[in-house]
Amino acid sequence: MPVRERPSMIVRPRPNFLQLFFIMRGSVVPRILPQIFGFAVYSAVILALARWFELDLGVFNITPFGLVGVTLSIYLSFRNNAAYDRWWEARKLWGTLVFEIRNLARATTSLIPDPAEQRALLMEALAFCHFLRGQLRKTDSIKDARAFIDAQAETVAGFANPADEMVRRMGRRANAQRRAGDVDPIGFRILDERLASITAIQAGCERIAGTPLPFAYTLLVHRTAYIVCLLLPIGLISTTGWATPLFTALIAYTFFGLDALSEELEDPFGTEANDLALDGLCRVCEISVFEALGEAPPKMLPAEKFYFS
């Protein structure tokens, strides 16, 4: 069967209270650790200087920082919601693709009398799934596609849009069956409708992959988060004292953690911890197709330390 890439989506049971603070796999903490540690050290330096020079920072009130923090939280919430909408729409599109592949398998085995032609068309459908996954992840999917269409995979990979070429090939194969009289016009229309739905799914995925969130939002959030964390120790020292580095690190964790999570969800087709398990969804399509053909299906891809690829 096709060779798989490194795992991406993490699925695990809800951790208990003690595990909650020590889980790193699937957490954004490793990505934002430099910011957390850096601002903790920075606030410790500010605190030490204030104590050494006996500076009176009581004139700095925490209220303005709270107002800025609320504003930043609103922007982070908007960006997080927008990123999650992209992630959820991508998941729905791939769920619909599984649905359409099953419909295509059922229609193909019912309407095309020749078992060899049935298998050829459905193998092209599976190659389409893998080419689409490769295009969305910007990875080489020739090895995966070769398992279903043999040497044709190299030829198809030479097209600007290999997944679209696979749909065209399926359409030509279905039309050849119609011209030969093996499939009547109504049956051909059913097959063509399935291919049209698959094309619409591909276009939806390409729209998400090709349209990132506006850069201005990212820039605004990053600038504001850094400014708040840089000025925050000055406003906290008079009230939190020696605990200032701890509170600064906690606030940095919140702001930069939400930002990092939004960045992961913004591109749902990648291979990070919270991206979609496209390899697993392709395997679901493979199982459905092989069962429709009456052949032994492959097994589901196992999780690797709670990760599904």
Curated annotation (Swiss-Prot):
InterPro entries tied to this protein: Bestrophin-like (IPR021134), YneE/VCCN1/2-like (IPR044669)
UniProt keyword terms in alphabetical order: Cell membrane, Ion transport, Membrane, Transmembrane, Transmembrane helix, Transport
The keyword DNA-binding appears for this protein: no
Location(s), subcellular: Cell membrane
Record GO terms (molecular function): chloride channel activity
Record's keyword annotation contains Hydrolase: no
Membrane topology category: Multi-pass membrane protein
Transmembrane segments: 32-52, 58-78, 227-247
Protein name: Voltage-dependent anion channel-forming protein mll4386
Organism of derivation: Mesorhizobium japonicum (strain LMG 29417 / CECT 9101 / MAFF 303099) (Mesorhizobium loti (strain MAFF 303099))
